[in-house]
Amino acid sequence: MFETEKEVERVILVAVDDGTNEFDAESCLDELEDLANTADAVVVGRMIQKLGAINRATYLGSGKIDELKAFAEMKDATGIICDDELSPVQIRNLENALNLKVMSRTLVILDIFAKRAMSAEGKVQVELAQLRYNLSHLTGRGKEMSRLGGGIGTRGPGEKKLEVDRRRIADRISDLNKNLKEIERHRSLLRENRNNQTPVIALVGYTNAGKSTLLNALTGAGVLAEDKLFATLDTTTRAVETQSGANYLFTDT
């Protein structure tokens, strides 16, 4: 993966309330704001549109797009983050209408992953996810992304480079898959060398639920624990011996 020089992204959060989501739009945007902050963006506003159905071409209605464009100019925004997953056509049409970079929740999460991954396996997995995401969202976006600059989504493989040579992307994905299989094979060998009788306990929970904090309290592992979404991306396993002499392996998933 490659990282660009850090830029401060000023973003507006956008959601469509079509009545199908079990969570209300404001709650979804609250979490999206946490994600944006974790990705080092500055949230300067939010906007929700109630629609019977999401517009397949532009995500938002034409009137709301005009309102959003004026709001973005007033707030000096540099980008828009939509709570929903957008199609390549929706992204292209919104970027053309707003003259701003348009991002989805998925792109923000992948950007956070690119920043947080520390292990070789984690970095390979994140780059694979970025390449696959970008490959599926290339349609007509090379020019727009080049014009709209860096920020969120520019950690990892760049859009302009991806647009130039799809075959190289496929080759890179193939190479990364081979690397990942080799890493997994090495990990399997390490597992076989461990005492197979030792119980393994996995700490499972939503992001920022406190898994790393609990692992540190139980084992003294010293794993990074912050009040941020996806603060820990890589898996950590530590051995613990109880007062009775029993041994356990705790894994921060």
Q: Which residue ranges define each predicted feature?
A:
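A residue-level signal for conserved active-site and pocket-lining positions in enzyme catalytic cores
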Residues: 32, 131, 169
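Conserved G1/Walker A P-loop phosphate-binding module
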Residues: 4-11, 141-253
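Flexible beta-alpha connector loops of hexameric P-loop NTPases
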Residues: 19-24, 54-58, 116-121, 160-161, ...
